[in-house]
Amino acid sequence: MKTTIILILLTHWVYSQNPTSGNNTATLCLGHHAVANGTLVKTITDDQIEVTNATELVQSTSIGKICNNPYRVLDGRNCTLIDAMLGDPHCDVFQYENWDLFIERSSAFSNCYPYDIPDYASLRSIVASSGTLEFTAEGFTWTGVTQNGRSGACRRGSADSFFSRLNWLTKSGNSYPTLNVTMPNNNNFDKLYIWGIHHPSTNNEQTKLYVQELGRVTVSTKRSQQTIIPNIGSRPGVRGQSGRISIYWTIVKPGDILMINSNGNLVAPRGYFKMRTGKSSIMRSDAPIDTCVSECITPNGSIPNDKPFQNVNKVTYGKCPKYIKQNTLKLATGMRNVPEKQIRGIFGAIAGFIENGWEGMVDGWYGFRYQNSEGTGQAADLKSTQAAIDQINGKLNRVIERTNEKFHQIEKEFSEVEGRIQDLEKYVEDTKIDLWSYNAELLVALENQHTIDLTDAEMNKLFEKTRRQLRENAEDMGNGCFKIYHKCDNACIGSIRNGTYDHYIYRDEALNNRFQIKGVELKSGYKDWILWISFAISCFLICVVLLGFIMWACQKGNIRCNICI
């Protein structure tokens, strides 16, 4: 009886051991790289899926300063572009300046006779895109009037002065004759003329300066005509002046003629600005300008353009990422992450990719782990790794190429009377941003889905390649591992990895070992049940033996049993 019990317990222990730990078998598992803490990305089918690595696609911060390279950035300091163009005394340093981007500061102010420009935004945009304040004086003949009017509101140094690009005409003696002046454009470029009309604060000031009780200014070309009549009346005082000057502008094409007719209140041009076509622009910003390199500028400062999208500012200049609403979009640049289970059981069994990934595999994305007579080991499969990396590399650059703007997004400005146009423009811009935000999210989700499917496919391809090599010499264990039924040392494992494994060499040995092991080994589907039954029978037999011993001892008188009621 004792012998039977010992044999049953021994058999139970033997069945509990790892059947692949012998010298005549080996275990080969295929797996992929994993990390302890992956990155969540969005795909077409999942809002959140964990991958081993991902790249942020949205630039959400600027460097806090505007780089002056590779663009010529002109700091307007205390001057607006229009004041610099008109020749405000405190902006004389900007005469004949050139720029790619003119930076207007919030601290900019006018320091001359108070003026308004009915179409300020258009004039500002035209001058900004020209990229220069190059000015050419012309010999206008103003007969019978006094030129070079001045004002105490516009001082140049300690003397009264006026805008350097404009000529304020007043009466000569007690007369102001009707003026008729023409100026042809015989050049092959457009000319921009700036002129204006003075609005006195009182009728007395009107006759004192221009004799006539009501003046008039008409400026014409072959294509256009503007007639302006002064609005006489008191206005809030600015730098001691309650009068105003309204500034207008006229573009004269090659072969056209500029005609000026006036009987009073004319602020005449002194020459023209040469119009240029280019990609120069203007931007309002208080960010400091520094010596650095950046191809994208926003009012918040320059930003890198190595990402396809940005959430810093809608207004940009240069080669910039596309503006979207999202603060973050992550592009998967690694495979699906399945963190490795830290506890593998009593015998430290290895597991394949079906169960989890492998942490610590730094030399490749896909690889092998094995157990054989020489111990355990791990090696990466560089071919499948490179195949996946080659297809993922360049993905970010392709997204950038599709989305980076090669032009600047200018500020949209409209006068108060164009409120409906401004509302429409805002609606169009917001709609464009909404569409781009949606397209960006969809594009990234598609790319992420493709990356994950691609890396999964490479894993399956490697598994199928290994299975075709091993054939009947091994059995698929269902967890990404193969049980090899012949002795397979490290050299043998290496031949499987590099594709030189010859299954015919090991075929006979594998078949013999398979039959021998199958005679003892139990299929995993029934093994647990048999082990539990064996354990139950063992316990039952122990109880029977113990009960028989007690009964035998009672009969011999070695044990006395008293039952008390």
From Swiss-Prot:
Extracellular topology ranges: 17-529
GO CC terms of this entry: host cell plasma membrane; membrane; viral envelope; virion membrane
Disulfide-bonded cysteines: C29-C481, C67-C292, C79-C91, C112-C154, C296-C320, C488-C492
Lipidation positions, renumbered (S-palmitoyl cysteine): C554, C561, C564
Key word Glycosyltransferase present: no
Membrane spanning residue stretches: 530-550
One MF term in the entry's GO annotations: host cell surface receptor binding
Source domain of life: Viruses
Modified how: Palmitoylated.
Cytoplasmic topological domain: 551-565
Site positions per UniProt: Cleavage: R344, G345
Function description: Binds to sialic acid-containing receptors on the cell surface, bringing about the attachment of the virus particle to the cell. This attachment induces virion internalization of about two third of the virus particles through clathrin-dependent endocytosis and about one third through a clathrin- and caveolin-independent pathway. Plays a major role in the determination of host range restriction and virulence. Class I viral fusion protein. Binds to sialic acid-containing receptors on the cell surface, bringing about the attachment of the virus particle to the cell. This attachment induces virion internalization either through clathrin-dependent endocytosis or through clathrin- and caveolin-independent pathway. Plays a major role in the determination of host range restriction and virulence. Class I viral fusion protein. Responsible for penetration of the virus into the cell cytoplasm by mediating the fusion of the membrane of the endocytosed virus particle with the endosomal membrane.
More about this protein: Major glycoprotein, comprises over 80% of the envelope proteins present in virus particle.
Family: Belongs to the influenza viruses hemagglutinin family.
Record-given protein name: Hemagglutinin
The species this protein was found in: Influenza A virus (strain A/Equine/Fontainebleau/1976 H3N8)
